Amino acid sequence: MVAGASTGGLYAYTDALCRGLCRIGAEVTVLTNQLWVDLPRPFRVERLLFEFTDKKKQWSQLHWAADRFYRSLRNSLRRNQFAVREHFDVVHFQGVGTPLLDQFFLKSLRRHLPVVLTVHDVKPHYERFVSRASFIKRSLQIPHRLIVHYEDGKRQLADHWSVSTDRIDVIPHGIMRLQNPPDLTAARKKLNLPSNCQIILFFGAIRPNKGLDILLKALEIIKSRNQQILLVIAGGLLGRFNFEPYSDIIKKADLSNYVQTFIHFIPEEEVDYFFAASDLVVLPYLKFEAQSGVLLRAYAHKKPVVVSDIGAMGELVSSDKVGLVVEPSAVEPLAEAVINALDSHDKFQSCYGPELENKYSWEHIAKLTMRSYEAAISGEPSPSCA
C-alpha cells in the first residue's frame, strides 16, 4: 500500500482499510513519506520515502519546484525498487502522486507487479495546469485495476479520463468506527451550545462550492417556521476566501440569533463533538466530484442528512434512506428538506441498522478490495464489487 498522508481523511482511510485487510488474512505493508503515529498495528509501516514540505516555498518558486521534483523522483525510484525487491503480490496506490513521473514509473512497476490505484477524487478540486491533466490521464491508463467509491464516479472516470469501465471497480468508502463518542448533552456542553433547540451542522473547509450562502438563505425560511433552530458553522477558510459574504447574509437576514460560528480549523480530537451535538447535518454543495468526508462522519454518528444531488452524495443518501436529497442552489427546496428531515429525525436515524453497518464495515470493504487485487493478479475482469 502506497500512501503519503499521516493525518486527515486519507490517513484514516488507509489505516482502516489496512486493518480490515489484515482481519481477513492479508499481509500488508504501507510505504509512506510521513511519520505515522506510533500505534499498535497489525501491519508493517515503512517510512521509506522523502517527505514533501511547503517550507521550501520560502525559497524562489523555481527552487521549490526543483526540490519537489527531486524528492518525487527519488521517491518513485525507491518505491519501485523496494516493491520489486520485496516481491509483493500487488501494489495498491492511494491516489495519483506526481503525475509527470507516475506516467513513467507506474509503467515501469507494472512490468514486474500488478498495480491497483484508488481514485478518491475523480475530478480534482483544482486542476491548475492543462499539462497536469494530461499527465493524470496517461497515468490512469497504466494500473491493472482502478477503484472508485460510487457508481457515478465510474462513469465520470470513464468519460473524463477515457478509462475503460472494464478496469474500474466500485468499492464504497468504509465508515470509521467511533471510539467512545460523546453523547448529545455532553457534546453541547463541551461546545457551549444550547440544549433546548434543534441544531443543524454545516461542517468542513469553507469555500464557495460548498453552498453555505444557499443554506443561510434557506435558514431565513426555516426560522420563520421553527424558532428553536440553530445553525452551527464549523470549519476553516481556505486560501483567499473570507467569511465576509456570509456575514453579510447573516446580518441582512437578521440571522445572528440563529447562527453560531467556529471559523477555524477544527482539530481531529474536537470533530466528534460537533457531530454528536447536532440533530441534522446539511451538505448543500454546488459542485463536488469526490466522496465527502463530512457525509461519512455523519454516517458514523448515525445522523440524518440533507445533501445536494451531486457526486456520490445524492446517490448514497437516496440508496441508504438516511436523509433527503435536493437539487443544488435551490433555496426553498433546501429549506423544506431541512424542515422535513428534522420532523422525520427518528425515521431517518432508524435506517442506520445492521444492514448498513455491514455494507460499510471495513471487513466488507477489505473483501471487495481483495477481489480487485485478485483480478489485477489474474488479469481477468473483477467480479462485481458493488
Task: Give the location of each predicted region.
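Conserved acidic donor-binding segment of nucleotide-sugar-dependent glycosyltransferases
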Residues: 319-320, 324-331, 339-346
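Conserved donor-binding/catalytic core segment of Leloir-type glycosyltransferases
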Residues: 194-210, 216-219, 231-232
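N-terminal strand-loop element at the rim of the active site
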Residues: 3-8, 12, 19-73, 80-82, ...
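A short helix/loop element that forms part of the nucleotide-sugar donor recognition site in Leloir-type
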Residues: 180-193, 246-247, 350-351
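Carbohydrate-associated surface elements
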Residues: 152, 174
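Short hydrophobic beta-strand element within catalytic cores of glycosyltransferases
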Residues: 280-281, 304-307
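Nucleotide-activated donor-binding/catalytic signature segment of Leloir-type glycosyltransferases, i.e.
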Residues: 244-269
